[in-house]
Amino acid sequence: MLGSKPASGRSRERIELLVVGALTIDRFPDGSAAPGGSVLHATRAAARARASVTVITAAGGEPETQEALRELRSMATVVLEETAHTLVFEHDERGGRRELSLLGNVRLRPDVRQLQRMRPRVILLAPVAGELDAVALRTIDEAVETRVRVAALQGWLRRREADGRLMPNVLADLPQAVLAELRNCDAVVVSHEDLGGDDAAPDATAALEVRRSLPGPGVLVTYGRAGYVRGVPEARQPTVVRRRETIDGVPTVGAGDGFAAVVAIQLAKGSSLSAAARSADAAVERWLARQPGAVRKPLPS
């Protein structure tokens, strides 16, 4: 069970974190491209937190992917499932709204023998497009002994249309076998946008929605620069945490993945979900504040 405070001597201990998810290539309207994926952003945050990281990922041989793998290998031990092509996200702006399309298809199939040799203190499940199906989740669950499991839900909450466009997927509509595996997690992290919400300020409704489908884990729903909502099984109502000020003028790509990684690390140290979320929020804020052009601004009360 998760503790309410760090065990003696563990606050400075290097936590062994296993991150699982596919790499991506992001292509933008101006023709540029960059490596991406929750596994990359989460590993960067874990490295900043001085965790010892192992990554299980899938990717092809494109130049952007090789760049990402070089970076990952500088921060973590990498177990690679080679695929014909890396998943590609195409970004588009239409009528002032951003649209995302997906090219390719990946299903991660971690090797049981490799998994059984791993002894992570915590696992972060971080798919980008459903590559962790019930088979993969069950394999990981049965093969890896670990104290804490955390899932970043984004990759399960994307539904691909016939033309490749990605639309929000309803959590309750996921396969029951996937939901059953996710209910075994200690915590789940998701943004309100991935849940299909457009509220600017944190609201308890989204966390209640997640808890209806996943009543077991602690729930953290992030609201970008505005704050987050925290829900735990033993509390009837979620707790809304609003920021008093925000970091503006810099992109927040990867911030949610970094938040999830630090939450996972802190839970593995024995922190409560409340303390883990505070640490993660502060870590993301420090990271954003160091970016060129970052400006602190008060938020409306």
Regions found by a protein language model. Name each.
Residues 2-14, 173-176, 202-301:
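Conserved phosphate-binding/catalytic region of the ribokinase-like
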Residues 44, 88-91, 227-231:
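Short beta-strand scaffold segments in enzyme catalytic cores
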Residues 10-17, 24-33, 48-150, 301:
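Conserved N-terminal subdomain of the carbohydrate kinase-like
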Residues 43-52, 265-269:
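Alpha-helix C-terminal capping segments
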Residues 22-23, 258:
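Active-site metal-binding loops of divalent metal-dependent hydrolases
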Residues 122-206, 226-227:
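Conserved beta-alpha-beta core of the PfkB/ribokinase-like small-molecule kinase fold
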Residues 29-35, 162-164, 199-202, 291:
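Short, solvent-exposed loop/turn segments at secondary-structure boundaries
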Residues 55, 186-187, 218:
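Well-ordered beta-strand positions
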